């Protein structure tokens, strides 16, 4: 049974005259009626806020795709190709005819790995055929010189949601989840031409190899400290770590030359690589690659396998039903053709008046931030100058890009092929494009998110913010909402993203996005004290579905704090400002009803605090909250002045 989390804490049903007080629980006071009305769709783990907007955008765009397909009229050749992929993915009859065979044909490449010695010769082939590897090679922005690219190596993914699940204290959850996964794997492997004995052997070996990986790869908490991914090593040093393979040969075949330096994103994993991948574990690896590769392929095969392949994630996220074939087809197509789809959505559904108004808010926030930095008491003048310089250089990407990237012109596929082969072809083009980037300069004009995505981000290595058109709607933003409501919604979110330039990660990068210590020793010491206080404010909070890890979510909490601080200052200068509207809309944007399983998953995987804490804890740090609602010491949303945290 899935228990729905309706409220912050369990309470006896009250009379209508005995409602939750805003001074005790802002989130529930604002969202209680909405939470009672919301119904979580069978194919979703949650509803409300971001998710509701995303579903609405999806409905709009599915209808757009269907109309284009029906009329055979497309705004451009990119959307024509996207709709072609949509139709292929929706063709259940063709997928049934193709069955499991496209995946089995690709997996047969593993048969060519006759001995451990052949692995290095076949690495490129395995990579381009998208088979799971014991380590990945990719090209990324060089974090210390963001104008150029670098070569990175990274460990593989694990079966459990996160590497933290392999720790002793998670043994019970681990056993339960691996039981669900094993059940799924057995049903999928039964569709292959392997004997029952081999099927079981492959699955057993996969679990053994996965256990080796799980004890070495990074946890989500470790990944959240993204600056710590940057561990440059001379290629000669990496060769000694990977001495069980011919690493230089692999690099030469992929790039045509051997890079001098490699960025080792997971030092612990690669220091133990010889224990992970050697002659004794080679068969374990082959069987792991086969099983994981097949399961990862299921969504692109027939409907029965698409259903089977989703069992594990649906079980751990509390989702009863699989995504419909139509939704799946749209999601696949709009993901692969993300920029053209986002550009179309933005041009059609995001008005120039709104874009102008939002952009005005952005620059008002940046200017206010500069003033707050100048008046900040924890920074010395030299550090303030650097911080203000960084703010001056922040790029703003609002709505959607002017044009799509050139790679979409390379997306050519055979419409008669199976869905598996079509997607395989397109992903292969992306892999090649990534490798070819190694000698090219980075492109700061590239958008991190497409226009139809309900999200926003700050890119620390470009020093810019991206706000896709899809998030720029009610309750976050509307030209019809008051300025106070918009500041409590999209304004605080914009401030949040800008604040990432100065969070526990972003503060380590300069105005060009390069890792560069621009802080004085004393400033850094005072800043670290603030970080520790922010960790403490959230750490260990008990919710009905689990305990909060303050270290894991500290950067996002700092950003929420900064976003509220800067927009509350703007409120002071806003004509007819209503702090009630500001705080109530702040709570409204975080409204979410979710399955317990999903909420538990987020505690381990999501770098953001649970929505209820984002709504309820951040305001407590600001005097405006206390003045607006006359919050007293006896109220639950009261924090003593000495414990309130305002960083920027």
Protein language model annotation of sequence segments:
Residues 21-25, 29-90:
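Active-site-surrounding "flap" and adjacent substrate/cofactor-binding loops of secreted or lumenal enzymes
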Residues 60-360, 364, 401:
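Noncatalytic, helix-rich "gating/capping" subdomain that lines the substrate-entry/channel surface
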Residues 15-36, 170-190, 554, 561-566:
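Hydrophobic/aromatic-rich, well-ordered segments within soluble, folded domains that form packed cores
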Residues 34-38, 160-161, 475:
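Short, solvent-exposed loop/turn elements at domain surfaces
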Residues 54, 206, 212, 235-248, ...:
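Intrinsically disordered, low-complexity linker/terminal regions across diverse proteins
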